A protein has these predicted regions:
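Second-shell loop/turn segments in exported
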Residues: 33-39, 71-86, 97-106, 154, ...
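Proteostasis/folding factors centered on peptidyl-prolyl cis-trans isomerases
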Residues: 137-171, 175-178, 192-193, 197-272, ...
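N-terminal targeting/tethering segments
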Residues: 25-165
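Extracytoplasmic
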Residues: 30-38, 80, 187, 230-237, ...
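Secretory-pathway/luminal and periplasmic proteins that interact with or process carbohydrate-rich
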Residues: 121-133, 203-207, 326-334
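Short, low-structural-confidence N-terminal segments
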Residues: 1-83, 87, 217-229, 244, ...
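Solvent-exposed loop/turn and edge beta-strand elements of beta-rich ligand-binding domains
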Residues: 1, 13-15, 42-57, 106-108, ...
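Solvent-exposed aromatic/hydrophobic patches embedded in short alpha-helical segments
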Residues: 73-103, 111-122, 144, 148-149, ...
Length: 435
C-alpha cells in the first residue's frame, strides 16, 4: 500500500502555476506554449510546470527533514521556485548553444556508455528513494513494484529513464565545455605561499592563546591545522570501563543524591522536608560510595593485568588494541595512531585523565591505573609533544595549490557562463505561466 506523501500537497501546483480562467484551454496546446526560446531551442510551459513541481517537491522534502514548514500554496514560494527553474533553463540553453558552437556537443562512444551507466545509477537511486519514502509497506512483488514506482515517477515527477539519460549526457557535455574554459587557468607558487601565510596567521590568531580549541579540532579530525600552540601533549590510553551493572547502580544512587539536593535547594521546601532530604541525601551518598567502591573492585583485576603485561614488555599499541574500551583508541582511528591532543585545564576531557597525563614527566612514560568516577580506570601513555609553530609549507603546498586552483577555475567558469547567459538573445513569455 502506498504511503501518504508530500505529493498530495503538490498535486495542486499545476493549478496554482496556471490559474483558473473562464476560458477553457486544450491541455496539450497549453503545455506546448513556449516560455523560453534561444535560437531553435525552446522550453515549454509543460516543462517549466513539471520542473517547478519537482523543485518544490524536493524543497518540501528538505524542509520536512528538519520539521520546517514549506507552504506550497504561498505565491512567493511558487514565484521563487519559478525563478529558480527559469534561470536554470536559461543557463542550460546558453550552455547548449556554446557547446554546439565549440563543437563539444557530440559524445564519443565511450562518453555515451558512461552517460548510460550514470543515468541507470541515478534512475535507480531515485527509484529506491521513492520506494523507501512512499512504498515501504507495499506487498507487491519486486518487478511489479518497480513498474509501479517507475510509472509513478513519470506521472507525478515527470522523471523517466530518457530524462535521466539526457541529464547524464548534459553533465558530460558541460564537463567538456568547462574543461575548454578553464584549461589555461593557473595558480603561481607566490599565490600559494601567500595563501599559506594567511592561513597560518589566521590559525595562530585562533589557537595561540586557546590550545583547548586546537586540541578539540585535532581530535575531531580537522585535516590540516596551520598553527600549533605551545603546551599540547599527545596521549594514548587503555580504558578499563565499569561493568554495566555497576554503572547502573552508581547512576541510580547519584540520581537519588541529586533529587535530595533539589529539595534542599528549593526555596519553598519546608523544614520537615529539608530534614527528610538531608537524611535521604546522606543515605543516597552512602549508597553511591558503596556502589563506587564495588565498581572499582570489580575492574581492579583487569587493570592490574594490563599493568603487569606492560611491565613484562608487552607492546603498548598491541595491548591497547586488545584491551582498551575507548572507541577513540580503536584500530583505524586517527587518535589511536597519534594519541589524543590534550592541554592543561582542558575541560572536554575528564579532569582525572588530564591531570594524570600531565603528572607524567617524559615522553614514553605510562601511568598507574587512574581512577575516574565517570568511566573506570585510565592507564595513560605520554605519547609525544605537539611541535609548536606553523605547519611546514612543503607538507601542505600541493593541497593548497589544488584548493586555490579549483576555486579559481570555478570562479572563471561561473563568470564565463554568466556572461554567456547575459549575452544570449532569449525570447521570454513569462506571462504565459499566469494564464
Amino acid at each position: 500500500m502506498k504511503k501518504k506523501s508530500l505529493l498530495g500537497f503538490l498535486m495542486i501546483l499545476p493549478l496554482l502555476l496556471s490559474s483558473c480562467t473562464l476560458i477553457k484551454k486544450d491541455a496539450a496546446v497549453d503545455a506546448a506554449t513556449e516560455i523560453i526560446r534561444l535560437g531553435d531551442r525552446t522550453v515549454t510551459k509543460g516543462t517549466i510546470v513539471s520542473s517547478v513541481n519537482q523543485q518544490m517537491y524536493q524543497m518540501a522534502q528538505l524542509y520536512a527533514q528538519f520539521n520546517y514548514s514549506y507552504d506550497v500554496t504561498d505565491p512567493e514560494v511558487i514565484a521563487d521556485a519559478q525563478n529558480t527553474v527559469i534561470n536554470a533553463y536559461k543557463r542550460d540553453l546558453a550552455l547548449r548553444a556554446k557547446a554546439e558552437e565549440l563543437g563539444l556537443d557530440q559524445l564519443t562512444e565511450e562518453e555515451e556508455a558512461q552517460a548510460k551507466a550514470d543515468a541507470e545509477e541515478s534512475f535507480q537511486s531515485n527509484l529506491d528513494q521513492i520506494r523507501e519514502s512512499e512504498y515501504a509497506d507495499s506487498t507487491l512483488g519486486e518487478e511489479e513494484l518497480k513498474a509501479e514506482i517507475t510509472e509513478h515517477m513519470e506521472k507525478e515527477h515527470g522523471y523517466t529513464m530518457e530524462i535521466a539519460l539526457n541529464n547524464a549526457r548534459d553533465v558530460i557535455v558541460e564537463g567538456k565545455v568547462k574543461d575548454s574554459v578553464i584549461k589555461d587557468v593557473t595558480v603561481s607558487d607566490e599565490e600559494v605561499e601567500a595563501e599559506y601565510n594567511t592561513r597560518v596567521e589566521t590559525a595562530k590568531s585562533n589557537y595561540e592563546d586557546d590550545a583547548s580549541s586546537w586540541c578539540s579540532a585535532f581530535n575531531n579530525g580537522t585535516s590540516t591545522l596551520y598553527y600549533t600552540p605551545a603546551g599540547v601533549r599527545y596521549a594514548k590510553q587503555i580504558l578499563i570501563k565499569f561493568k554495566d551493572e555497576d554503572q547502573a547502580a552508581m547512576t541510580a544512587a547519584s540520581g537519588k543524591v541529586t533529587a535530595a539536593q533539589a529539595i534542599l535547594d528549593a526555596e519553598d521546601s519546608t523544614e520537615e522536608q529539608k530534614t527528610q532530604a538531608e537524611a535521604d541525601k546522606a543515605a543516597a551518598q552512602a549508597e553511591l560510595d558503596a556502589a563506587k567502591a564495588a565498581a572499582f573492585a570489580n575492574i581492579d583485576a583487569d587493570a592490574d593485568a594490563v599493568l603487569a603485561d606492560l611491565a613484562g614488555g608487552a607492546d603498548w599499541d598491541t595491548l591497547m588494541a586488545e584491551k582498551s574500551q575507548d572507541p577513540g583508541m580503536a584500530s583505524g582511528r586517527k587518535t589511536a595512531e597519534t594519541g589524543y591532543a590534550v592541554c592543561e585545564n582542558m575541560t572536554s576531557f575528564d579532569s582525572a585523565f588530564v591531570n594524570g597525563l600531565f603528572a607524567l614527566e617524559k615522553v614514553g612514560d605510562v601511568s598507574e591505573k587512574i581512577a575516574s568516577d565517570l568511566y573506570g580506570y585510565y592507564i595513560i601513555q605520554y605519547t609525544g609533544d605537539a611541535v609548536e609553530g606553523p605547519v611546514a609549507l612543503d607538507s601542505v603546498k600541493e593541497d593548497l595549490h589544488s584548493s586555490l586552483l579549483t576555486t579559481r577555475q570555478n570562479t572563471v567558469y561561473d563568470d564565463t557562463v554568466s556572461g554567456w547567459v547575459e549575452a544570449a538573445d532569449f525570447k521570454l513569455d513569462l506571462s504565459a505561466l499566469k494564464d
